[in-house]
Amino acid sequence: MPQLELISWFFNFLLAWFFLFIVVTILLKINFPSTNYITVTHPQKLNIFNNWLWT
């Protein structure tokens, strides 16, 4: 059954991307104070987010 093989490959592909996304998100949360990505794009939103975060 080649169709079943394709489905299992697609599932493994999705699982790998999902795992990669989780790892990247965790790394970004660990390195959040040292990254200037959000500061460059949305300074006002970052200030609102920081105020909400520290209250």
Swiss-Prot record:
Membrane protein topology class: Single-pass membrane protein
GO CC entries: mitochondrial membrane; proton-transporting ATP synthase complex
Disulfide bonding pattern of the chain: none
Top-rank lineage group of the source organism: Eukaryota
Transmembrane residue ranges: 7-28
Compartments in which it is found: Mitochondrion membrane
Primary location recorded for the protein, binned into one broad class: mitochondrion
Sorted UniProt keywords: ATP synthesis, CF(0), Hydrogen ion transport, Ion transport, Membrane, Mitochondrion, Transmembrane, Transmembrane helix, Transport
KW Transport (keyword) present: yes
GO BP term, example: ATP biosynthetic process
UniProt similarity note: Belongs to the ATPase protein 8 family.
Function per UniProt: Mitochondrial membrane ATP synthase (F(1)F(0) ATP synthase or Complex V) produces ATP from ADP in the presence of a proton gradient across the membrane which is generated by electron transport complexes of the respiratory chain. F-type ATPases consist of two structural domains, F(1) - containing the extramembraneous catalytic core and F(0) - containing the membrane proton channel, linked together by a central stalk and a peripheral stalk. During catalysis, ATP synthesis in the catalytic domain of F(1) is coupled via a rotary mechanism of the central stalk subunits to proton translocation.
Subunit organization: F-type ATPases have 2 components, CF(1) - the catalytic core - and CF(0) - the membrane proton channel.
Protein's UniProt name: ATP synthase protein 8
